[in-house]
Amino acid sequence: SSQLVAAPLDGAPEGTNVIGIYTWLKSNGSFTILNVDEEGNEINYGKGDVVASTPAETVALAAGGTPFTVAEDGLYYVAMNKADNQLTIIPATFGIIGDATPLQWNGETAMQASYNETQATVEYTISDVTLDKKEMKFRYSGDWGLEFPYQGGKVKLHTNMGYNGDNASAISEAFSECKGGGANFQVGKAGVYTVTLKLDLRTGQFSAKAVCTAEDTSSATLPEKMFVNGDAWGWPQDWST
């Protein structure tokens, strides 16, 4: 079992009662939501009536209801709205976005997902991608956030990962911690990269790195003048001239 924690919401008022977890789900399995009340009583919740179908399905939780399933193996964010006793299951297929990336800020360049059950990690990787010396983030869902029902209105989940700090920071060849809605990553030099976003399923921590495999030298500064030297012209004694 995995414990749900406070959801990374965008601009939600204090006291918003939504918890959730990023987790890898398999299409050949199922799951329920186990709730333990203050007296230690356990209730298993399954699928009840559908509350909303877009942009992701939200359902009412039903005690003893049908277990939840997904159509495809993959990473999902499971959000539980405790105020209304509802559940939303959101596919989280990450890509890279930003003016450093091929699609600029217009869309996500797809990454390839892999799940390591032994190490309990999920990695999204893209290889041989050309990045400019600009900025980037990681994003899914085609938008910066995804809204789902809450108390007659909506709340928005951050669907982008950035640097775990207040200001933009360079992405390096060592993993740096990320957070939902975090600051942009800065690409230090233009070139061809292998970029990885990793999730540790045991801690819920995302981290990212970018390894340059070929530096772009097309914009390198060249000298304004060059000279030929040798026997035909005489060898100067002062090589600084």
Segments (PLM) and residue ranges:
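Insoluble glucan recognition modules
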Residues: 1-241
